[in-house]
Structure formats: C-alpha cells, structure tokens
Amino acid sequence: MTPRLAATVLVVRDDPFEVLMMERNARMLFASALVFPGGTVDGADFSEHWLPLVDGASGLEQEERALRIAAARETFEEAGILLAESSAFAPDIPRSMRFIDVVRNAGVRLGLGGLHKIGHWIAPEVAARRFDTHFYVAGVSADTIPVCDGGESVALEWIAPARALELAEAGSRNIIFPTRMNLKRLAESHSVAEALEAARRPVYTVLPVIEATRDGHIVRIPAEAGYGTTCDRPHPDVTR
C-alpha cells in the first residue's frame, strides 16, 4: 500500500517553552490520543494559485511546498491559528472556507519559511493505514490563543514537551510512538529559538519495522534515527 503524504506541526511558544497538542476525537483513528495538529496533503495544496500567497517558497520543490501549505492548513483547521509570514494569529474567518480563500480574505501571505522540518516518518509496510508524515516546527508568540475545532480535536492544550512525555510514561495520556519520539527531540530545547536552531540538523527518514515476538509485536526503528530509543509496542490502530 502506498502511504498517503501528510504533514504535522509542532507549534511552540516561549514563557514557558511549550508545544501545542490536541486530543483526538474518541470516534476517530488513534482515538483520544494526544497529537500535534496535522493531516494528509490535499490536491489543492499543490495548486500554482498559491504562489502569490506564500512567502519563503523560493527554492522549494512542488511537493515540499505542498507539504508546508498542508501543514499550515491543518494548523488553521484544527487549532484556528494562521501561520502568516509576519506573525501567527487567529483570524475571525470560518474554517469551513477554502483555505486559499481564508488566506486571501485575511490579506496575508503564508509563512512557509517559518516551518522547519524536524522529522520524517513513514508508517510500517504492514500497517493497516499508511502515512508518509513530515514533521515541522513553527514558533508563535506567547499570547497566541488556539481554538479547538470540535471535530477531529476535542481539546487543545499548551504543554511542556518533557511533561507530555511524563504523562505518556505514566499511562495517563495516550501518545503514539512517533509523536513521543518527536516530543523527546523537542524536549532537548528550552526555547523557540533553540527548537528552530535544532531543526537545522539533517532529517533522517524513519521506516519502522514491526516484528513478532513471543511476548507480542514490537516496532523497531534504526539507532541512526537519533531518537535514543529503538523499539516500542505498536499502537493497535497501526496493526488492525
């Protein structure tokens, strides 16, 4: 099965350093999991009509441009935050409107240059649903107020990366393996500036492998991926 191209965004702010996470709807894939805003790339994200409406697209391949547009679109649709070229803000514009019209009506240009890739994960070949997901980090001002869409997400919260990892380890929050690994990497930073600087490192494409053992299935990733962890239990939604 060919994986679907997808983008997700680690939206971060200072004072204190936190990342925006959302709780998935209990009726959807990865039910009630704590995730970053994100989703699959649409055909409209590839449109040439975007060219006069984006900033920072010079030198980007068409697919990379579409990925960043999708990342910005999902951030707006799920959290109400528009990642514009000058600053991120929450425009009073219906989220049901086509995203390209949202940007036009807001009178801004999307800040594609403010989206920095920090991860690339492709779902295991045996996964029931496969996504080719590109992870980005984007900084916003400390007073940015996200607004839950009430559809795919039922709650939004700012949380310190290390705290999110603690909750996952304690079993009080459901956070899937790729999300935890990117939280772990983000927790190495202590400010938006540090997180953006860390995003300058080369990105390793991770293709996890699911193995059967006497104690059940495990998912493995290469040590070269640099996450400091090489195995975990796969989420049930990955294998069913």
Question: Where in the sequence are the language-model features?
Answer:
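N-terminal leader/linker segments that precede catalytic domains of diphosphate-processing enzymes
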Residues: M1-R240
